[in-house]
């Protein structure tokens, strides 16, 4: 779900820069791959990757890709509405809501995604592979699965007060 209005300023964070080498007849060709997460700290976040022979160019390409890849994250106050588990490749991510003031208890790539999404209180655990791109993809997949109480009630055909 790409957002066309660039009126809001997006913050960007470089999660990983990888030097990739291709061995050819004439020697080694080196390139850089960048993984960047962007967000407005207000419920919108996205990630992108870029490759180039120069690091700044790879980062620029990744930021452009990330801006085209924004998703909306439903929030309840400063946390997420419910617990969610998601997988991508070998990476598994568990996200749990936390009480207000608890802060973001998350490592590296997960922290970048949830902070830029604007989630201030969350607990997370990364299991399996710790490859940054797969962790970021699993985290974003988990955030996509989140539903507000109103949405769940509507799907079940009951009122929000009957959900408990």
Swiss-Prot record:
<comment type="subunit">
    <text>Part of the 30S ribosomal subunit. Contacts proteins S4 and S8.</text>
</comment>
<protein>
    <recommendedName>
        <fullName>Small ribosomal subunit protein uS5</fullName>
    </recommendedName>
</protein>
<dbReference type="InterPro" id="IPR014721">
    <property type="entry name" value="Ribsml_uS5_D2-typ_fold_subgr"/>
</dbReference>
<dbReference type="Pfam" id="PF03719">
    <property type="entry name" value="Ribosomal_S5_C"/>
</dbReference>
<dbReference type="GO" id="GO:0003735">
    <property type="term" value="F:structural constituent of ribosome"/>
</dbReference>
<keyword id="KW-0689">Ribosomal protein</keyword>
<dbReference type="InterPro" id="IPR005712">
    <property type="entry name" value="Ribosomal_uS5_bac-type"/>
</dbReference>
<comment type="function">
    <text>With S4 and S12 plays an important role in translational accuracy.</text>
</comment>
<keyword id="KW-0699">rRNA-binding</keyword>
<dbReference type="InterPro" id="IPR020568">
    <property type="entry name" value="Ribosomal_Su5_D2-typ_SF"/>
</dbReference>
<comment type="similarity">
    <text>Belongs to the universal ribosomal protein uS5 family.</text>
</comment>
<dbReference type="GO" id="GO:0006412">
    <property type="term" value="P:translation"/>
</dbReference>
<dbReference type="Pfam" id="PF00333">
    <property type="entry name" value="Ribosomal_S5"/>
</dbReference>
<keyword id="KW-0687">Ribonucleoprotein</keyword>
<dbReference type="InterPro" id="IPR013810">
    <property type="entry name" value="Ribosomal_uS5_N"/>
</dbReference>
<feature type="domain" description="S5 DRBM">
    <location>
        <begin position="10"/>
        <end position="73"/>
    </location>
</feature>
<dbReference type="InterPro" id="IPR018192">
    <property type="entry name" value="Ribosomal_uS5_N_CS"/>
</dbReference>
<keyword id="KW-0694">RNA-binding</keyword>
<dbReference type="InterPro" id="IPR005324">
    <property type="entry name" value="Ribosomal_uS5_C"/>
</dbReference>
<dbReference type="GO" id="GO:0015935">
    <property type="term" value="C:small ribosomal subunit"/>
</dbReference>
<dbReference type="InterPro" id="IPR000851">
    <property type="entry name" value="Ribosomal_uS5"/>
</dbReference>
<dbReference type="GO" id="GO:0019843">
    <property type="term" value="F:rRNA binding"/>
</dbReference>
<comment type="function">
    <text>Located at the back of the 30S subunit body where it stabilizes the conformation of the head with respect to the body.</text>
</comment>
């Amino acid at each position: 779900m790409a957002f066309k209005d660039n009126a809001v300023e997006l913050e960007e964070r470089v999660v990983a820069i990888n030097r990739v080498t291709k061995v050819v007849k004439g020697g080694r060709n080196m390139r850089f791959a960048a993984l960047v997460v962007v967000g407005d700290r207000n419920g919108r976040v996205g990630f992108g990757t870029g490759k180039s022979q120069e690091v700044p160019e790879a980062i620029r390409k990744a930021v452009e890709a990330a801006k085209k890849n924004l998703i909306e994250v439903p929030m309840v106050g400063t946390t997420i509405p419910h617990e969610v588990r998601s997988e991508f490749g070998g990476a598994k991510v568990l996200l749990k809501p936390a009480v207000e003031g608890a802060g973001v208890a998350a490592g590296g790539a997960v922290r970048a995604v949830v902070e830029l999404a604007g989630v201030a209180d969350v607990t997370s655990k990364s299991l399996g592979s710790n490859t940054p791109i797969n962790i970021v993809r699993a985290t974003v997949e988990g955030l996509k699965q989140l539903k507000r109480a109103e949405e769940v009630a509507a799907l079940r055909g009951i009122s929000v007060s009957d959900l408990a």
